[in-house]
Amino acid sequence: MTTPDALEPRTCIRVLSTRLHSRRGLYLILAMARTTQADLARQFLALHDGRKTLVLPNAWDVASARIFEEAGFPAIGTTSAGIANALGYPDGQKISRSEMLAVVHRIAAAVAIPVTADVEAGYGAKPEDVAETAREVLAAEAVGMNLEDTVDDRTDLLADISLQKEKIRAVVETSALAGVPFVLNARTDVFLASIGAAETRLARTIERLNAYRDAGAQCLFAPGVKDKETIAQLVSGVHGPLNILATAGTPPVAELEKLGVARVSVGSGPMRATLGLIGRIALQLREEGSFSLMTDGAMTYADANRLFTR
């Protein structure tokens, strides 16, 4: 018979939960869960120490998460756009918080490495709303989250800096109460949304990210930047680990590491690449009646099932 000692921490917790029914047993389970999540959070935070650029793949379901884990990545992020699209929503907080975090929870429960959640602008205009989102992210077993400074679903308007700092502080306080060294990745969309005159964007981005760092954010995210000169200026100007979004034209990881970038994420790129492949398969199947795009390089049926039977 398999014993709890032979299982991974999360599995062990589930097994124990079926055997311990006393109040004391419940407290033991909760303590173990908190310790395990805190350990994963510490592992994830340590990956931002700047000694090596953290390459963070972004999953949209359990299958993609398990593939990234099997590939040897030390941590996984989720992609809000990927999860939303997979469930039939456009990106931009059109999917509900509960639906988003249900997927995050399934991903976190399926892998043995840290998971950080993309929860867009935090699902609320007030700090207390964002604090509740952070509590639910923690309940979903994630150890970090992205927080954008956009307003509602508008891409042309950013939140007031002082209000965004209050939201960040609310997340930091929430994670401290939970006893988890949560990694908050504070994002500004100045470059991504082309906010303001082009010549002002660098200074505005640095101002915002440093304000977010002062409020307690552990990592600082500036999507929409891809030229090496601007990246180098951001690394020099911000007072914390910098996260860059990999898109077409982004320098390779080796160059980003030389520039001092702490973290590179890929967002919805892999999910959209998968959709592109499905589109090509569909076109070949309909127009040619052939199957090579589907069969060449495909994961075997056995390997696909093996992802979920460890």
Q: What is each residue range found by the language model?
A:
Residues S17-R19:
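Ser/Thr/Pro/Gly-rich low-complexity, intrinsically disordered segments
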Residues M1-L7:
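Polybasic, low-complexity intrinsically disordered segments
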Residues S265:
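Active-site loops and adjacent core secondary-structure elements that bind or stabilize anionic groups
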Residues T35-L45, L54-L56, W60-I113, Y123-G240, ...:
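Alpha/beta enzyme core
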Residues H21-A31:
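Short, Lys/Arg-enriched N-terminal segments with co-localized hydrophobic residues
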Residues A33-A38, F44, G269-R310:
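Extended, intrinsically disordered, low-complexity segments
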